[in-house]
Swiss-Prot record:
Pectinolytic enzymes consist of four classes of enzymes: pectin lyase, polygalacturonase, pectin methylesterase and rhamnogalacturonase. Degrades the rhamnogalacturonan I (RG-I) backbone of pectin. Glycans are attached at residues 46, 351. Keywords: Carbohydrate metabolism, Cell wall biogenesis/degradation, Disulfide bond, Glycoprotein, Lyase, Polysaccharide degradation, Secreted, Signal. One of its GO terms (cellular component) is extracellular region. The lineage of its organism: Eukaryota, Fungi, Dikarya, Ascomycota, Pezizomycotina. This is Probable rhamnogalacturonate lyase A. Its EC number is 4.2.2.23. One of its GO terms (biological process) is cell wall organization.
């Protein structure tokens, strides 16, 4: 039995629950949506511009009061309506090229969303940003302080800061799409999480990453970036983005398996229900089993991916009908590509096989995994700027095959900072014939690409890589188009005994320190 004191203390909360009623309250300027959840959630949507102006959860105001939560930097103006049908409420916000939905199910402390576009927003990116009260929600999850820029001094552009001796940026909150199912902001009594179960209309593939959270001092921002120009390798996709869900809890972290199939009954523009989709199943084979394998499908309208099981078997997510390019990755390194067609209501069987093929290896530095794994500073680069005092020296470095550690080789070389990197190796008399030096890269900046010199032989200057027009390594990105450069080494260039290779950054552009032309290494292999 509850004590009298406990009952008295509980009265305000229980009164709120008892008085809660699922529904819409309409005022001259706003719609107030009551979710009728056990931990009460009410939020207010501006009827003229679609901004969320209030989020009252469990008696606390979680919305930052200086600026609303919205698509982009706000729609400016929109046609906004709200309807209730049984246990569902739908708020629809429309402009000439964009329709945004807020959907609430009776009893759930969740704001479900979806965004349909027929043209890219004028700001050049499509995102939802929840601007939340950072007094009640100061923390960022799962990566913590790396993206808390409050009180910092800008050191690069307006998005990389120095805070208490550490470099921080909103970009350092990113996670690969294939692994990013949930990111949150939290405090001692509240947690708000963005749950992401549908990336089909986003861009960049399974390994793309973008901004997730940023406590900038005025508010704590919780994002879902559907597309942007941040190291983006694909064109933007139109159509419906989502559903995605903003989940409110008191202390626990919500699961990521949220059923949004009810969207099929809510007249959501562009929504494709499960019965109008198909799947692909099969088996991948041939790649190095020490790495995780990923299968990826994409076309101009949609993208999907999955990890394979340990035996290589896989089943895709439910896909829109159409013909797709199907890619098989060893880690993040593409080893095979084919095409497959998907039909509604059926599962297509399609196997895929591939491997990394080189030759008789003289030496290999790193692994063909599409990432700078193990190289110097690679473990830190996702979460801090290259100038950070916690980084090891960038060099220029010398790597000696057979005695150096992998961490003695830099993850990246910069034209104005640590170019060239030097490799020393010993060859036998049987290894003095013609050879190939293969230099794998993952991302370039300002036209940076490798030029190699082997003893007295100087390799050609490669053609410039495709320009992503985006800062990369300084903002925690390492993945671009993954250019691989082969240098043909004439017979007699390699000598029996000690040999020296230098790899330099070449580019017609220039820049200071870490904004000079650069590229990130994947693997360097010499073979015959």
């Amino acid at each position: 039995m509850l004590s009298k004191a406990t009952l008295l203390l509980s009265l305000p909360f229980w009164a709120r629950v008892a008085n809660a009623a699922f529904g819409i309250t309409t005022t001259s300027s706003s719609y107030v949506i009551d979710a009728n959840s056990a931990s009460p959630l009410k939020f207010t949507v501006n009827r003229s511009n679609c901004d969320i102006t209030s989020i009252n959860f469990y008696g606390a105001e979680l919305q930052y009061q200086g600026t609303g939560s919205h698509i982009g930097s706000g729609l400016g103006s929109a046609s906004v309506s709200a309807t209730q049908s049984g246990d569902y409420i739908k708020v629809t916000c429309s402009t000439s090229t964009l329709t945004h939905y807020f959907v609430v199910h009776n009893g759930d402390p969740i704001i479900h969303m979806a965004t349909h576009i027929t043209a890219e927003p004028s700001i050049g990116e499509l995102r939802f940003i929840a601007r939340l009260n950072n007094e009640l929600l100061p923390n960022e999850e799962p990566f913590g302080q790396v993206s808390n820029t409050a009180g910092g001094t800008a050191i690069e552009g307006s998005d990389v800061y120095l805070v208490n001796g550490q470099t921080r940026s909103k970009f350092y909150s990113s996670e690969r799409f294939i692994d990013d199912h949930r990111h949150c902001v939290s405090g001692s009594a509240h947690r708000v999480c963005m749950i992401l179960n549908q990336y089909e209309s986003s861009s960049g593939g399974p390994f793309h990453r973008d901004i997730n959270t940023n406590n900038g001092g005025q508010y704590n921002a919780l994002y879902w970036y559907m597309n942007s120009g941040h190291a983006q390798t694909e064109a933007n996709r139109m159509g419906l983005h989502g559903p995605y869900s903003m989940y409110f809890s008191r202390s626990g972290t919500p699961g990521t398996n949220i059923d949004t199939s009810f969207f099929a009954n809510l007249d959501i523009k562009g929504y494709v229900p499960a019965n109008a989709r198909g799947k692909v199943s099969g088996k991948a084979s041939g790649a190095d089993s020490t790495f995780k394998w990923v299968v990826h499908w994409y076309n101009d309208e949609a993208q999907y991916w999955t990890y394979t099981a340990s035996d290589g078997s896989f089943t895709s997510p439910a896909m829109k009908p159409g013909t797709y390019t199907m890619v098989y990755y060893q880690g993040e390194y593409k080893v095979a590509s084919t095409s497959v067609s998907v039909s509604a209501g059926s599962t297509t069987t399609k196997n895929i096989s591939g491997s990394v093929t080189t030759g008789k290896t003289i030496f290999k530095i790193g692994e063909w995994d599409g990432q700078p794994t193990g190289f110097r500073n690679a473990a830190n680069q996702l979460r801090m700027h290259p100038s950070d005092s916690r980084m090891a020296s960038w060099g220029p470095l010398t790597y000696t095959v057979g005695s150096s550690s992998l961490s003695d080789f830099p993850m990246a070389i910069f034209k104005s900072t640590n170019s060239p990197v030097t490799i020393k190796f010993t060859a036998s008399s049987s290894q003095t014939g013609a050879a190939t030096l293969r230099i794998g890269t993952t991302l370039s900046f300002a036209g940076g690409r490798p030029q190699a010199k082997v003893n007295s032989f100087t390799g050609p200057v490669p053609s410039a890589p495709k320009d992503l027009n985006s800062r990369g390594v300084t903002r925690g990105a390492y993945r671009g188009f993954g250019e691989v450069y082969d240098v043909a080494i004439p017979a007699g260039t390699i000598v029996a005994g000690t040999n020296t290779i230098t790899i330099s950054v070449v580019s017609g552009s220039s820049g200071d320190t870490f904004l000079s032309p650069n590229f990130i290494f994947d693997c360097v292999e010499l073979f015959q």
